Amino acid sequence: MRFEGSNSMTLLVDDLVSQAQERFAAASDAAALENAKARFLGKEGALTVLLKALGKLDPEQKREMGARINQAKQQIEALLNARRAALAQAELDARLASETIDVTLPGRGKAAGGIHPVIRTWERVEEIFRSIGFDVADGPEVENDWTNFTALNNPLDHPARSMQDTFYVDMHDADGLPLLLRTHTSPMQVRYARMHKPPIKVIAPGRTYRVDSDATHSPMFHQVEGLWIAEDISFADLKGVYTDFLRCFFESDDLVVRFRPSFFPFTEPSAEIDMMFTSGPNRGRWLEISGSGQVHPQVVRNFGLDPERYIGFAFGSGLERLTMLRYGVNDLRQFYEGDLRFLRQFNE
């Protein structure tokens, strides 16, 4: 850049402002604008070169041109900031245009959750039994072999102990006993009975696990088991308690209940409990609903009690089974497929 004097420098400064305005206006994005800025305001920019050339002028001209160059710098910076703002606004407008909301589209409903039908049954069962004086037990889902089988009078060669029916865990407890996923909620009753003195009146609802899966069985399912032990409990008490429970749960006073002789290692005598509706889609059909019986003397001993003094009854029902009958569901697997269309109907 060559200068003849202050007049030529003044013309050059004015021309630089015009050039900067054109260059900035031509910049289509932030990167191009920064490149244009460097051409005028950078370390090697045109204004920097002019400032270095002031040394060739006399003091009066240096003062005059210095002021003019600083004024030009302010003008160029103002043009730069204005273009930056314009580019930023254009970018924002483009983004907003691409994110335009079509207000004519139907709105989305609130994604409010609901209580699972099996949990509804769980809560209802607890409420009914609490109302007649039963406590509610809790316990671990990973159990030892003794509490799950031996304490309940299951012999070592019982089929339920096989790996085809039980999920075993490759670990042992502190006493060296094999661990497994509990196959029923009876272990909670064992633990409760060994920690409490008679009379013992408790239900044990919870998750259980067995190697089984079809329309009416699941590898994980829910059970509720009941236990009442005292000095004067009879089979008649079992019939009265469970019949009243079913009639309350299904809200049907005309529901018919029968007890069929059966066998379970932990009760003697044992009975399957069937029920029959006298109205509705299941009218006239006998439906198996529970297993029950008088607690076996050996099980009473394993509770730490004297079977000559204490007697009691026990029962066990599948919560999924109760839920299926209450709501008319035919396939247990529907409860766990996560189909909101199916689950939502229980919360309407």
UniProtKB/Swiss-Prot annotation:
Q: Which sites bind Mg(2+)?
A: 268
Q: Which cofactor does it need?
A: Mg(2+)
Q: How does it assemble?
A: Tetramer of two alpha and two beta subunits.
Q: Which Gene3D superfamilies match?
A: Bira Bifunctional Protein, Domain 2
* PANTHER family referenced in this protein's UniProt entry, alphabetically: PHENYLALANINE--TRNA LIGASE, MITOCHONDRIAL (PTHR11538:SF41), PHENYLALANYL-TRNA SYNTHETASE (PTHR11538)
What is written in the cofactor note of this entry? Answer: Binds 2 magnesium ions per tetramer.
Query: What's the protein called, per UniProt?
Result: Phenylalanine--tRNA ligase alpha subunit
Name any one Pfam family assigned in the record: tRNA-synt_2d
Q: Which GO terms describe its biological process?
A: phenylalanyl-tRNA aminoacylation
Organism of origin is: Bordetella pertussis (strain Tohama I / ATCC BAA-589 / NCTC 13251)
Q: Which family does it belong to?
A: Belongs to the class-II aminoacyl-tRNA synthetase family. Phe-tRNA synthetase alpha subunit type 1 subfamily.
- The highest taxon in the source lineage is Bacteria
What is the catalytic activity of this protein?
A: tRNA(Phe) + L-phenylalanine + ATP = L-phenylalanyl-tRNA(Phe) + AMP + diphosphate + H(+)
Q: Which CDD domains does the record associate with it?
A: PheRS_alpha_core
